[in-house]
């Protein structure tokens, strides 16, 4: 079986699926009886956009309801169920980073370090992209492996690298709601408003995942509330469409503070 792509352009051919909004915080389903992939969706498809009796002309219009998914497979993570389970020694640097296997990751980096490099920092591997352009740091950020992220950053991993479809460590950490990792990356001066091929920004991903603390952290560091994704959604539009009241309240409070700061102190006279 060919490995599932890490990022897929899922433009619906017939009708867009309706996302499960009952448990918005749980964006990952690793149950082997359901699927061998982990799919993280960005943009919602509202119920009125789904018409089971839609004809061919309507189907073409539904292409505007673009669903951006990042698919991270169990095979790529090295935990695929098989007759011959993978050992840690057989995993790639990307799989080790995704699983947070720090000891093995360090050994892997040392073995691949440049012979002329006395610090053995593994510079020729630490920013190595996989077939989709994902670096070890991007993988670790996507799966919330904060100690691995901290280690990779300390060893010189570049947090500014973008994958082939402009996915970033910050966007994937925001998508997963990994607020501490988001802060670590922002401390390295990454672009807080970086956008991917679909116009998705870290703030849009955090809102889509209903990650309140992550939204707060991004807003506190200056994330742009006015940016629109290619679907036409702003962060506020997205929160309203999905019924995420707490996220909406956080953004409303932020807007109010910005407005008050522009007015300055009120003269009592």
From Swiss-Prot:
Keyword list, A-Z: Activator, ANK repeat, Cytoplasm, DNA-binding, Nucleus, Phosphoprotein, Repeat, Transcription, Transcription regulation
Tissue specificity remark: Expressed primarily in thymus, lung and testis.
Pfam families registered for this protein in UniProt: Ank, Ank_2
UniProt function note: Activates transcription from class II MHC promoters. Activation requires the activity of the MHC class II transactivator/CIITA. May regulate other genes in the cell. RFX binds the X1 box of MHC-II promoters. May also potentiate the activation of RAF1.
GO molecular function, one term: RNA polymerase II transcription regulatory region sequence-specific DNA binding
PTM comment: Phosphorylated by RAF1.
Taxonomic placement: Eukaryota, Metazoa, Chordata, Craniata, Vertebrata
Name of the protein: DNA-binding protein RFXANK
Source organism of the structure: Mus musculus
């Amino acid at each position: 079986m060919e490995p599932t792509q890490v990022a897929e352009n899922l433009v619906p051919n017939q009708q867009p699926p309706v996302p499960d909004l009952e448990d918005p915080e749980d964006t990952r389903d690793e149950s082997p009886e359901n699927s061998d992939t982990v799919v993280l969706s960005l943009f919602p498809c509202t119920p009125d956009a789904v018409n089971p009796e839609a004809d061919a002309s309507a189907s073409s219009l539904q292409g505007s309801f673009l669903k951006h998914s990042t698919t991270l497979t169990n095979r790529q993570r090295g935990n695929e169920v098989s007759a011959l389970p993978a050992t840690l020694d057989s995993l790639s640097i990307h799989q080790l980073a995704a699983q947070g296997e720090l000891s093995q990751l360090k050994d892997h980096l040392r073995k691949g370090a440049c012979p002329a490099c006395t610090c053995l920092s593994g510079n020729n591997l630490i920013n190595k992209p996989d077939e989709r352009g994902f670096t070890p740091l991007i993988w670790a950020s996507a799966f919330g492996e904060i100690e691995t992220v901290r280690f990779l950053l300390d060893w010189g991993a570049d947090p500014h690298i973008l994958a082939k479809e402009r996915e970033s460590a910050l966007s994937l950490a925001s998508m997963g709601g990994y607020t501490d990792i988001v802060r670590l990356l922002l401390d390295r001066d990454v672009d807080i408003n970086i956008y991917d091929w679909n116009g998705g920004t870290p703030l849009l991903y955090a809102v889509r995942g209903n990650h309140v603390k992550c939204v707060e952290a991004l807003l506190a560091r200056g994330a742009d509330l006015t940016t629109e994704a290619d679907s036409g959604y702003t962060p506020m539009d997205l929160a309203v469409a999905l019924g995420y009241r707490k996220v909406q309240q956080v953004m409303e409070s932020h807007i109010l503070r910005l407005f008050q700061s522009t007015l300055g102190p009120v003269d009592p006279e």
